[in-house]
Amino acid sequence: MKSNFHDYSNLVLEYGDGFNSDHNFSIFVSNLPYSKSRFAVEWLLQKKFSRAVIMVQKEFSEKLSSNEKHKAISVLANYGFRIKFLMNVKKSNFFPIPKVDSTVILLEKKKVISKVLISTVNRVFSYRRKTLQNILKQFGLNSTSKKRLDELSGDEIIKIAQKIIRS
């Protein structure tokens, strides 16, 4: 494949596990292993780049954009990226035919997110059925709020995680 792009000195194509590479990049393109999609999105959230085009399982792409019934990954992804759906890819377009459909999405970087913030948001979501008062108590903080995570916006959840980190 490199021989097809030898005229492009600013293009570096890497074949292999890019997650173990320490190269800087401005654009990331990948047909991700579906079992690594969440890991890949969290990894990309920590990197400085302009945009990524990735193919993921359709169900996962729906989780990323979900504003109802928040998931930790949707809160993080929407905080760090502008997400655009480019196209659906039917399972019948592959051989052998997989069990699921796919979606190609564009992730435009809004901000780099620290590993600590990602970890804290994930920990907060491990208490998702508790009230905010009880969640914050787990981290040694006080609150009188009886709201649950599902009642908060993604930005409010990020602010709670940032408050936990600062404490």
PLM regions and their residue ranges:
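Conserved Class I S-adenosyl-L-methionine
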Residues: 127-129, 134-167
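Catalytic cores of RNA-modifying enzymes
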Residues: 1-123, 162
